[in-house]
Every structure is written in structure tokens, then in C-alpha cells.
């Protein structure tokens, strides 16, 4: 399953569960929003910028997705860095301005392939949620550290 299908399935699932989509992106879509490194971390204008695959909000919660077509450890590392070092906090605050978001959670969306799910589960300490999807558009929550999908 391609990253585009993973993202579209998750977008549909989020919207059907009351999440407001703020931005989304998948390969060749051209729809994403570039988040810049905070000024104190930036060396060049767009260097180090990232484009999240999905940012959505519900109530006072924001969620930040990185979606892939399979397991990539580097995405877990990237999300952990974004989460713990707040390197993109200025751009996120600006993007979510006026939405009363009190917390942002970071996670991964992947296809429902057992080998990739098992590899992903070895890195759960770096993310807040792990979600998979399949060709039937089902979405499975494998990990949700703070119950954001059941409580929001």
C-alpha cells in the first residue's frame, strides 16, 4: 500500500471521527504546509523545514502524523526529536493559532503489515501513537499512549 493511500485512509477515518484536518500531504500532492525550524535553530531560510503528512485537531488536542508505506526507524527518530526538542514549536503555534490546542501528540501511520507493525512496536517510546490501515480502509490503533483517540 502506497503512502498516499495510507494518508487518505487515515484522513477519512479522522474526519469521520470528528477531527478537523488542518493540513495534509502525500508524495506529489503539493498540498502540504512547510514547518520551519525555530529561528534560533535555523541556519538558512528553508533548511531543515518539514512537511507533516497530517495535522488535525479535536477539542484541545492536536495530532501530527508521519505516514509511510512501511517501517522507517528514521521517522520514529524524527518525531521523537520534534516532540522532545520542540524545534518546530514556533511554526506549529502559528499554524494552530486560534484553535485552543493545549497538547500536540506525534505518531506514525503505516499499512497493516505484521512485519512492519512488529518493527514499529520496538520504538513506541519515541511516539505517542501508532496506527495502521488496510485496503478495506479499516484503521487499527496499535498504540495510543494517552488515549487521545478514545478520549477526544
State where each predicted segment sits:
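Active-site metal-binding core of divalent-cation-utilizing nuclease and nuclease-like domains
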Residues: 22-61
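Amphipathic coiled-coil/heptad-repeat helices and related helical stalk/stem segments
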Residues: 7, 47-50, 88
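Nuclease catalytic cores
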Residues: 1-19, 23-26
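Short, solvent-exposed polar/charged micro-motifs at secondary-structure junctions
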Residues: 31-38, 117-118, 140-143
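Charged phosphate-binding loop/patch that engages nucleotide di/tri-phosphates or the phosphate backbone
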Residues: 136-152
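A general structural signal for short secondary-structure junctions and capping/turn motifs
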Residues: 12, 55, 96-99
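Catalytic cores of nucleic-acid endonucleases
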Residues: 17-18, 62, 67-138
Amino acid at each position: 500500500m502506497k503512502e498516499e493511500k495510507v494518508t487518505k485512509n487515515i484522513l477519512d477515518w479522522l474526519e469521520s471521527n470528528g477531527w478537523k484536518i488542518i493540513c495534509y500531504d502525500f508524495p506529489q500532492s503539493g498540498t502540504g504546509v512547510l514547518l520551519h525550524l525555530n529561528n534560533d535553530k535555523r541556519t538558512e531560510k528553508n533548511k531543515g523545514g518539514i512537511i507533516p503528512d497530517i495535522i488535525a485537531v479535536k477539542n484541545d488536542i492536536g495530532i501530527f502524523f508521519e505516514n509511510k508505506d512501511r517501517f522507517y526507524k528514521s521517522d520514529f527518530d524524527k518525531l521523537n526529536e520534534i516532540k522532545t526538542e520542540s524545534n518546530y514549536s514556533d511554526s506549529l503555534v502559528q499554524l494552530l493559532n486560534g484553535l485552543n490546542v493545549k497538547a500536540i501528540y506525534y505518531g506514525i501511520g503505516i499499512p497493516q503489515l505484521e512485519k512492519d507493525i512488529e518493527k514499529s512496536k520496538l520504538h513506541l517510546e519515541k511516539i505517542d501513537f501508532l496506527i495502521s490501515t488496510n485496503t478495506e480502509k479499516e484503521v487499527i490503533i496499535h498504540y495510543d499512549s494517552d488515549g487521545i483517540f478514545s478520549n477526544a
